Amino acid sequence: MVSLVKNQTVSLSKESSALSQLHFGLGWDPVKKKGLLGGLFGGNDSIDLDAGCVLMDSTGKTIDTIWFRKLESTCGAVVHSGDNLTGEGDGDDEVINVNLSRLPANVEYLAFTVNSFRGQSFNDVENAFCRVVDQTGKELARYKLTEQGSHTGIVISSLRRNNGNWDFTALGHACRGRTIDDMHSDIVSAVIR
């Protein structure tokens, strides 16, 4: 498993032979409240973050968008696990599964995002991460999200088709937006360089 830093790229095809499916997991915890009242009343509030994925061609034109209101891509290759409203518990809070062999040939980029539909900022989030797991359950890459601040969205990472291989890049691009559509221009500028 490769632990990535911001703007680092890894070839997933080199990390896993016969790569056919990917599991993109996103996890987070609400910041624990400090002080007497925080301890008396549970210590934290729920944080509703939403994972999303934008399929794009080589120019950055959107082909499809997957998020909690559209859980499956038109081609059927990308499927969202559904909305986790709290961020509670260990492990992945939301998952996007990608069947690489079913992606249309014109899909060159997949941009993975997270945003707060409720408008909660990333000042209220800790221990956020994304990870990529192959079809055998092997974790190929992990990226710890450290982008705390008043923003409501992050373009987390991208997956790029590169001469038959798949390259995964940790982006960590903070932006504003309560929905994946609100973040569209930031997504394109972060992914297409």
Curated annotation (Swiss-Prot):
One of its GO terms (biological process) is response to tellurium ion. This is Tellurium resistance protein TerZ. InterPro entries: Stress/Tellurium_Resist (IPR051324), TerD (IPR003325). The keyword Coiled coil does not apply. Not known; seems to contribute to the tellurium resistance (Ter) mechanism. Also involved in phage inhibition (Phi) and colicin resistance (PacB). Belongs to the CAPAB/TerDEXZ family. The keyword Isomerase does not apply. Transmembrane segments: none annotated. It comes from Serratia marcescens. The gene is terZ.
